[in-house]
């Protein structure tokens, strides 16, 4: 079996909470080469792309779903956007839940839209990470 438009709306279980720490914020800012003071100091906020640290944990459920037959080595991440309600702060505990929002098939390529909802453990919605993935099925699986 492989992914199809019938999978649109499929939502995976929420990830375990991730504790945002000043150290992790600084590590990402350093990796990005961004020395903005907002990402350092006593009360740092996370760079907007910190969403991918959280979203990638939710992606694991998608790739582990044997019914979809998605293979990471056949995947290209083609588009990404973030919509934040508020920045992440040190001490935030955040969960992520992935939903398949679209699937289009062209030949042996599946174009998959996903949305990862990012929420504080207290229920506050923090933002979304939206992605488009291109998955090419091996020959014979089209």
UniProtKB/Swiss-Prot annotation:
UniProt organism field: Cutibacterium acnes (strain DSM 16379 / KPA171202) (Propionibacterium acnes)
Lineage: Bacteria, Bacillati, Actinomycetota, Actinomycetes, Propionibacteriales
Family, similarity comment: Belongs to the UPF0336 family.
InterPro entries: FAS1-like_DH_region, HadA-like, HotDog_dom_sf
Name used for this protein in its record: UPF0336 protein PPA1896
């Amino acid at each position: 079996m492989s992914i199809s438009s019938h999978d649109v709306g499929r939502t995976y279980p929420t990830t375990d909470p991730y504790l945002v720490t000043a150290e992790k914020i600084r590590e990402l800012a350093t990796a990005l080469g961004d020395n903005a003071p907002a990402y350092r100091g006593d009360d740092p906020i996370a760079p907007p792309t910190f969403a991918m640290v959280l979203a990638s944990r939710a992606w694991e459920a998608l790739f582990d779903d044997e019914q979809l037959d998605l293979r990471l080595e056949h995947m290209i991440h083609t588009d990404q956007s973030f919509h934040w309600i508020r920045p992440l702060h040190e001490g935030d505990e955040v969960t992520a839940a992935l939903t398949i929002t679209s699937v289009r098939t062209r030949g042996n390529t599946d174009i998959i839209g996903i949305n990862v909802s990012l929420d504080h453990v207290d229920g506050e919605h923090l933002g979304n990470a939206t992605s488009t993935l291109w998955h090419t099925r091996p020959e014979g699986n089209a």
